[in-house]
């Protein structure tokens, strides 16, 4: 690159195969454009040597071209651009050709003209132009090309422009306008055709036609890049290049791939897993172990799916994917890829009379041709050879622009490109996308060949393109003027990315006297295709009543009380229906998983008899860190991802800060006597109002004089942003009534008097329930409760006791818990809280209006499930 700094002034971020392929493609495109005029990069460097058009850069480009041509010829190949130039200058017509007729070609390349001029010395060459000779003799050159100077100023006579020029605000509205013009016809395909000057209109146009049961056919065919096989190969390419788990998940979600995995598992075990179970297990692996690569997934899947009673297809699927990638890395790449595609599509049944199957066959032929080329001699000339990722990248590059041709149905309407409209003979022509830059096509800001350089070199430029398109538009109009035909033009106001668009200059190419009226017509607002309707829900959700054997009627966890107090309906969704949102794309632990990680470290520490007696903060810190690393690698594998590594450092920091406090508690006489203590052992469950209450106390400590302390560890912030002070444990459990909020609006059992004498309501019962449950474990002993905050800043790290949790306050907590239990048994799950204090996992279901989005009819007591 240092030798060609005028072309590559800055080194690429990553100078790899992808960068080289794109750069080579850009330079080949420039050579192709120049070759239309019969020019090489060396020719351009010579022509622009004394110009102000970056001659230094053209010299560097010529140097690159020279090195490439030499390397090509040294390997026994010929430069195909030079071959084309020689053929144009010296070639002879094929045997048997005695006459050449060029009919209606408005824009032949200069190289083609040079070839025909050379042939004209050997045989007759005729040029046919569709135009009246009397008035347009001087509007074309000898080769039928429109003369730019003439067409730049020649008016285009659009019949009744006030009724034949239409506008649509967006591509979809342009499509609707086009389809409305077809409404009078019983068989639109027999009398009308649609022109598409802007490819952005194609998809909405096909959709609008399909909605009216009108088939669409594009004679230019479809790019291979739009087909499902290309999508599959693109994912395989990503897998080969990165082995990322994101690509693995996308790959398995391809229907044919998922079917292949299920089929293979059936062959191995005799039982075919369901598609739902396969995808559920894939999500489970993603959220449980956060694998970053296929190798991570291969290591972690056996741990996640270790239960012999619950088999999973995921480990077998991952092993198959790994074997596919290894086979692609073998010497016979083409055979391996063909066998892979054969296995993936083996379950499909192809029929010769099915148009979609015929397309598949054509695509298979194209894939085979490209694979043959990749196994050819040129592929072996790459330095260091081509690995599977490089071969797949080349395959995609070669296939992406290949064309396949679906079968045209009898009543389909044609969707012609702008330049193909010259050959369309439908009486009624509807042309969409009539915007500047599309018709006429414009060259704006080309990296190597801006419009000024094209003019200087005699290449196609904006003026010649305008002349070509003005002539084409005139031809479309005049060929229908006298035979009852019609041409409608539709332009847009905005593109698919909401960028503003201008009407085509061709639509302004009228007499000066008509220009004001034409301009005013363009400024009219586009007619509404449909009256806008206010947004409303399409339907209301109808939640079903819970069955009597649902677990929430028989046992509750202490944390579930908080969920019910927060919102009864969301409690019903989360715990009654067991609904939860899963983000299988996340790459780091969520708040709950991070908290569980720290809880696990502290539990393991508390169960080590040697660790619990430590009083040296450094030794405690070292013990915490060692346990943390063991747990992390046990869950997420030997290689931690970057996001998890960052979270690991956060965990180490928090535990390191707590180690100092932990040492202080030992020195103060608090000794750990239990960790992760269940308040309801299976052989002796704790019940309240006849309901079994489950829960786990994070830690139990004892002091010789102060009694027993129940600790719950929290990883959230202990700082109250509004009050600008540290939250007390009471603040987490009680919520003061808001200004204007009447106590009567809440059940009496939920109300309580806080420590400052104000009326509040219970928001959480976790520590009070722990206290009540553990009284039977430590009868007659003094019991206190506390929060330990393991937050992300050192000042927030600490232990906060709830010294006032006793007497009337504890009695109120018991009454509240009994009230919640009674309400759940009465199926009081309605109405919902309209707004939660933080984070709503079900907000997307309600569109911000839970009372409107849900029909609670079946939730009322006495309703029975359907």
Task: Tell where the protein language model's regions lie, with residue ranges.
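Polyanion-engaging groove/track-forming segments
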Residues: 1-612, 625, 629-638, 646-649, ...
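RecB-family 4Fe-4S metal-dependent nuclease core
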Residues: 349, 532-866
């Amino acid at each position: 690159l240092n030798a060609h700094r005028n072309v590559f002034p800055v080194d690429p971020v990553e100078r790899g195969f992808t960068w080289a392929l794109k750069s080579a493609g850009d330079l080949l495109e420039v050579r192709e454009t120049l070759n239309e005029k019969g020019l090489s990069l060396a020719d351009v460097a010579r022509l622009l040597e004394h110009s102000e058009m970056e001659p230094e850069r053209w010299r560097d480009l010529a140097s690159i071209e020279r090195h490439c041509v030499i390397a090509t010829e040294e390997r026994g190949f010929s430069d195909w651009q030079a071959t084309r130039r020689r053929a144009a200058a010296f070639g002879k017509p094929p045997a048997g050709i005695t006459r050449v007729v060029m009919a209606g070609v408005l824009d032949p390349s200069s190289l083609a003209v040079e070839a025909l001029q050379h042939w004209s010395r050997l045989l007759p060459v005729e040029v046919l132009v569709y135009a009246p000779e009397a008035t347009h003799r001087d509007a074309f050159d000898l080769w039928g090309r429109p003369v730019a100077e003439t067409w730049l100023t020649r008016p285009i006579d659009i019949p009744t422009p006030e009724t034949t020029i239409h506008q649509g605000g967006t591509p979809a509205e342009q499509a609707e306008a086009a389809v409305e013009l077809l409404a009078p016809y019983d068989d639109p395909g027999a009398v009308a055709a649609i022109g598409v000057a802007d490819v952005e209109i194609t998809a909405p146009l096909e959709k609008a036609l399909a909605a009216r049961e009108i088939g669409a056919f594009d004679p230019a065919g479809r790019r291979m890049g739009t087909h499902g096989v290309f999508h599959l190969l693109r994912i395989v390419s990503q897998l080969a290049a990165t082995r990322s788990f994101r690509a693995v998940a996308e790959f398995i979600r391809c229907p044919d791939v998922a079917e292949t995995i299920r089929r293979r598992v059936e062959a191995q075990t005799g039982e075919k897993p369901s598609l739902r179970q396969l995808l559920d297990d894939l999500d489970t692996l993603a959220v449980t172990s956060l694998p970053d690569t296929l190798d991570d997934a291969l290591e972690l899947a056996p741990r996640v799916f270790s239960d012999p009673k619950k088999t999973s297809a995921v480990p077998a699927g991952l092993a198959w994917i790994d074997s596919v990638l290894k086979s692609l890395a073998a010497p016979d790449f083409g055979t391996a890829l063909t066998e892979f595609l054969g296995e993936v599509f083996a379950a499909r049944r192809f029929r010769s009379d099915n148009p979609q199957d015929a397309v598949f066959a054509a695509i298979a032929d194209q894939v085979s041709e490209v694979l043959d080329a990749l196994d050819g001699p040129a592929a072996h000339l790459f330095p260091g050879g081509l690995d599977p990722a490089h071969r797949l990248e080349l395959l995609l590059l070669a296939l992406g622009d290949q064309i396949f041709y679906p079968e045209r149905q009898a009543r389909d309407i044609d969707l012609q490109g702008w330049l193909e409209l010259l050959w369309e003979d439908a009486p009624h022509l509807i042309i969409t996308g009539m915007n500047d830059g599309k018709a006429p096509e414009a060259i704006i800001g080309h990296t190597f060949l801006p419009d000024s350089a094209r003019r200087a070199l005699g290449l196609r430029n904006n003026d010649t393109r305008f002349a070509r398109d003005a002539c084409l538009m005139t031809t479309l109009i005049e060929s229908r003027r006298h035979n009852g035909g019609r041409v409608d033009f539709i332009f847009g106001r905005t593109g698919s990315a909401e960028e503003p668009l201008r009407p085509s200059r061709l639509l302004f190419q009228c007499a000066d006297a008509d220009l004001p009226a034409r301009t005013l017509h363009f400024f009219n607002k586009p007619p509404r295709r449909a009256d806008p309707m206010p947004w409303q829900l399409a339907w209301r959700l109808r939640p079903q009543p819970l069955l009597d054997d649902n677990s929430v009627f028989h046992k509750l966890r202490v944390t579930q009380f908080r969920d019910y107090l927060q919102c009864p309906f969301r409690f019903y969704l989360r715990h009654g229906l067991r609904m939860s949102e899963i983000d299988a794309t996340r790459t780091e632990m969520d708040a709950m998983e991070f908290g569980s990680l720290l809880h696990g470290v502290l539990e393991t520490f508390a169960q080590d008899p040697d660790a619990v007696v430590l009083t040296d903060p450094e030794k405690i810190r070292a013990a915490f860190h060692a346990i943390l690393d063991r747990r992390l690698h046990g869950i997420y594998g030997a290689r931690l991802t970057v996001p998890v590594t960052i979270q690991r450092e956060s965990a180490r920091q928090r535990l390191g800060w707590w180690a100092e406090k932990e040492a202080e508690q030992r020195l103060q006489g608090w000794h750990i006597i239990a960790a992760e203590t269940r308040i309801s052992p299976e052989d002796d469950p704790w019940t309240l109002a006849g309901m079994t209450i489950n829960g786990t106390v994070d830690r139990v400590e004892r002091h010789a004089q102060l009694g027993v302390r129940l600790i719950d560890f929290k990883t959230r912030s202990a700082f109250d942003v509004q009050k600008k002070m540290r939250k007390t444990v009471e603040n987490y459990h009680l919520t003061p009534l808001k200004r204007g909020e009447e106590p009567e609006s809440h059940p009496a059992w939920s109300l309580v008097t806080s420590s400052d004498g104000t009326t509040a309501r219970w928001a959480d019962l976790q520590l009070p329930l722990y206290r009540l449950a553990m009284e039977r474990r430590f009868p007659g002993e003094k019991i206190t409760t506390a929060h330990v905050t393991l937050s992300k800043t050192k000042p927030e790290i600490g232990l906060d006791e709830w010294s006032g949790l006793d007497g009337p306050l504890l009695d109120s907590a018991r009454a509240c818990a009994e009230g919640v239990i009674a309400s759940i048994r009465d199926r009081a799950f309605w109405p919902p809280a309209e707004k939660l204090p933080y984070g709503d996992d079900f907000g997307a279901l309600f569109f911000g209006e839970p009372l409107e989005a849900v029909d609670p009819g079946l939730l009322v007591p006495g309703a029975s499930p359907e």
